[in-house]
Regions:
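Canonical Radical SAM [4Fe-4S] cluster-binding loop centered on the CxxxCxxC motif
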Residues: 54-99
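Generic detector of contiguous secondary-structure segments
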Residues: 8-12, 78, 116-119
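Flexible, acidic/Gly-rich N-terminal and inter-domain linker regions that tether
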Residues: 1-60, 64, 72
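Acidic-residue sensor for enzyme active/binding pockets
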Residues: 22, 96, 121
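Conserved AdoMet/S-adenosylmethionine-binding subsite of the radical SAM
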Residues: 102-113, 118-254
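Ampiphathic alpha-helical segments that act as solvent-exposed interaction surfaces
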Residues: 49, 87-91, 99, 103-104, ...
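Glycine-centered small-residue hotspots that permit tight backbone geometry or close packing
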Residues: 29-31, 39-42, 69, 80-84, ...
Length: 254
């Protein structure tokens, strides 16, 4: 059997051995339970997250692989052990998303989030933008047998130095969100992990752009449609989260 399905508390992890892909769908406890950055004005203290039944109809989160393995060699990830075997085709990307939706058995949901964040660096795959647009057309067609009222695909990027088309990809992604995304547009997450450049270089093995270079690219991008771009950090006691450095490198308005 080429497809192995592992059930989780709120969804399934799908491993397609024949295609060499892994993807999943889960429910979501809601953004109100996420820890926010106080320097951005998010001061709510999270004491606990109430255990409750997650309803997939309210928010279905599908996470897919954009590549088979990954050309990045991050020291915190197992993907380098698999090697790199190329980009997922546009048909393959759409298949991951539609298969996950089909297995969820959701026909008409409130919100669909698609995260290009499982295996691979999505900005290396030019078909990611087109696949996200095609999914928008499928689920927002009133005559479709599967529909969602809101749609929010998200690209999570490590900002690779070697991607000569990085700026164009990010520009195309943000602009596509204005036309094909819901009120939040298309989401964009940057894997920063720490504000210490030496630690970042160790984590990403020197394959990610510097903080200044990332900040400069973000400043050149169109403004997000509504939801601001996200900076992701690996929060530990040793992680540098200096708010002054955040202000130095990154535009709070974006």
């Amino acid at each position: 059997m080429s497809r192995v399905i592992t059930k989780t508390r709120t969804g399934n992890i799908i491993s397609d051995e024949e295609l060499g892909l892994e993807y999943l769908f889960v429910g979501d406890y809601g953004k109100e339970n996420n820890i926010k950055a106080s320097f951005l004005g998010y001061d709510k203290r999270i004491e606990r997250v109430e255990h409750r039944q997650v309803t997939l109809e309210n928010k279905l989160v599908v996470t897919v692989s954009s590549q088979k393995g990954c050309p990045m060699k991050c020291n915190f990830c197992d993907c380098p052990k698999l090697g790199f075997h190329g980009n997922v085709s546009k048909v393959g990307l759409i298949s991951e998303i539609t298969t996950a939706i089909a297995l969820s058995e959701i026909k008409h949901g409130e919100r669909l989030n698609v995260h290009f964040a499982r295996m691979g660096e999505p900005t290396f795959n030019k078909y990611v933008v087109g696949a996200a647009i095609d999914i928008a057309n499928i689920i927002q067609d009133k005559d479709s047998d599967v529909t969602f009222k809101e749609y929010h695909p998200v690209v999570s990027t490590m900002m690779p130095k070697s991607n000569k088309n990085l700026k164009q990809f990010l520009y195309d992604w943000v602009k596509a969100g204005y036309e094909y995304g819901s009120e939040d547009g298309f989401g964009l997450q940057f894997s920063i992990n720490t504000l210490d450049e030496n630690d970042r270089n160790a984590m990403f093995r020197g394959m990610s752009l510097s903080l200044k270079e990332i900040g400069d690219i973000i400043s050149e991008l169109p403004n997000p449609k509504k939801r601001k771009f996200t900076l992701n950090f690996a929060v530990t006691s040793k992680c540098n989260l200096d708010p002054d450095l955040m202000e130095k490198y990154f535009d709070q308005e974006k």
